[in-house]
Amino acid sequence: MSTQSDNVDWVATVGMRYGARSRRVVLTAAVVATSLTVSFTAGCTHRGRDDDRAPQHIPAPASPLTRPASPAHSTAGSPLAVKIDNAPAARPQTGLAAADVVYTEPVEGGLSRLLAVYATTLPTAVGPVRSARESDLELLRQFERPALAFSGAQHKLLPLIGRAPLRAESPGAAPAAYYRGLGKAAPHNLYLRPARLLSAAPGKRALTTGFGYGPAPSSGGTRTASRTVRYPAARFTFTWSAQRSRWLVAMDGTPTVTTDRVPVAPATVVVQYVRIRGSRYHDALGNHTPYTETVGSGSAEVLRDGRSFAASWSRPVATGGTTFTARDGRPLKFAAGQVWVVFAPAP
């Protein structure tokens, strides 16, 4: 029997834990908190312009990046990770359908951000690009020195980013890789030219996520027409399309398409139950930034081929990927194609 709607609702839990308030306060927090983000300069950190206070118009570069290619820029096997804005004012996004993996993360005010990972394809542009969070550093350690494209970060977080085993590529570090687009107001209009950071897509070998791909389990699973996961101020719905053999994404009730009108449709969706706690960082109103713990183990749901499979996840160390097993203890394979991982709080 098909399940028409199966919701994960943690509005009350996270709303109380992280200080989600009225819409007016949330919007005020989003504006005020921008004063806390800063950018990198090439090779070092400092207090500079952030994603909200950057120049209103950064033209798209007319020529390739002119700085010499460093070993970091020519290293094979390093994927590109882009922190993507997911506020309603930022939609539709650009380049999202081309990502190999999309992680959804809770941020202040009950909102969400996306972390998109690119390895097999580099789209012409990606964005809007927004600021990084502490959780991103732990999540990205599974990759071999990835390039992280982000608009800025809270100044107290910058030393951590500077010491992390990744290439921090903010507008201050790689100004020629970014531009301000038309049609959206700042800070929702900062875009990345991936080719200015990576000379070529590194390929599947760079996706050291721990995911296995292959046929679905021959038995088990529940027929599922749609699945909804709720954050305090964001909602993700994945609806199975037998015609496309994909899950069609909708955010806050609106179908998700890119700026070039391509539907975002992953082959596999994972609802991963993790510990979400307050971090050491907070916004201007005192609301702690959520920290999503992705090292450890727990339960999960894997959606593929129109069915939902109960699973367990395990990531013993930050430098390793995450494996998923079915109830019978066998590895739970993903369908070939884009993967969305939605982090939800463990019960």
Q: Which sequence ranges carry the predicted segments?
A:
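A surface/extracellular/periplasmic glyco- and lipid-processing/surface-interacting theme
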Residues: A60, P64-V101, E108-A116, L122-P347
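C-terminal region of N-terminal signal peptides and the immediate post-cleavage residues
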Residues: S39-A62
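Small/flexible residues
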Residues: D6, A12, G19, R23-V26, ...
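Generic N-terminal leader/targeting and pre-domain segments
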Residues: G15, A29-V32, G48, P61-A62, ...
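Sec-dependent bacterial lipoprotein signal peptides
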Residues: M1-A42
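Low-complexity, compositionally biased segments
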Residues: D9-A12, R53-P55, Y103, P255, ...
